[in-house]
């Protein structure tokens, strides 16, 4: 009986440790970044229009699609920056004062996809994440929100948005990352920050 409980404990602890192993499976950014860099002229134009760092846009392209504009995920995310028509796409349309949502063919167009992706990053930074003071913390918060939603991130701090922002402002970038590792319900969240940094370092 003791042996059985020992085995259960070992399995449980192994599961806990693997939950936060955001470095597995390994990810080599070299090829995805190289392919994403071919879209840099468009990323620079979109970044200038929306006040978004084109290197951040390029890193997200590398992570999301590896630079392939025709990719459609199982969840329905489309194109270089893997935008979902009914969520991020609809948010951008609303921000532009347009009705409806973008079509799949529109999101497969590199210029339209990157423009809308940059717009969505701006919406996150100037909307639910507005008030975060540290630029590196903001960058981490933006990409986690891009991948998993701003609400999911803010709720790991507080159910009140302003209280959550205040708590975030008490952290530096490393402390914010550790919080995401420990508190965010999506294993993808810390992994996204890790991949972002690897992509930026590879540029």
Curated annotation (Swiss-Prot):
PROSITE patterns: PROKAR_LIPOPROTEIN, TRANSGLYCOSYLASE. This is Endo-type membrane-bound lytic murein transglycosylase A. It comes from the Bacteria. Transmembrane segments: none annotated. It is a lipid-anchor. It catalyses: Endolytic cleavage of the (1->4)-beta-glycosidic linkage between N-acetylmuramic acid (MurNAc) and N-acetylglucosamine (GlcNAc) residues in peptidoglycan with concomitant formation of a 1,6-anhydrobond in the MurNAc residue. GO terms for molecular function: lytic endotransglycosylase activity. HAMAP family: EmtA (MF_01381). It is found in: Cell outer membrane. A lipid is attached at residue 16 (S-diacylglycerol cysteine). A lipid is attached at residue 16 (N-palmitoyl cysteine). SUPFAM superfamilies: Lysozyme-like. It is an enzyme of class 4 (lyase). GO terms for biological process: cell wall macromolecule catabolic process; cell wall organization; peptidoglycan metabolic process. The keyword Protein biosynthesis does not apply. InterPro entries: EmtA, Lysozyme-like_dom_sf, Transglyc_AS, Transglycosylase_SLT_dom_1. Belongs to the transglycosylase Slt family. One of its GO terms (cellular component) is cell outer membrane. Residues 1-15 form the signal peptide. NCBIfam families: PRK15470.1. Pfam families: SLT. Murein-degrading enzyme. May play a role in recycling of muropeptides during cell elongation and/or cell division. Preferentially cleaves at a distance of more than two disaccharide units from the ends of the glycan chain. Keywords: Cell outer membrane, Cell wall biogenesis/degradation, Lipoprotein, Lyase, Membrane, Palmitate, Signal. Its EC number is 4.2.2.n2. It comes from Klebsiella pneumoniae (strain 342). CDD domains: LT_MltC_MltE (cd16893).
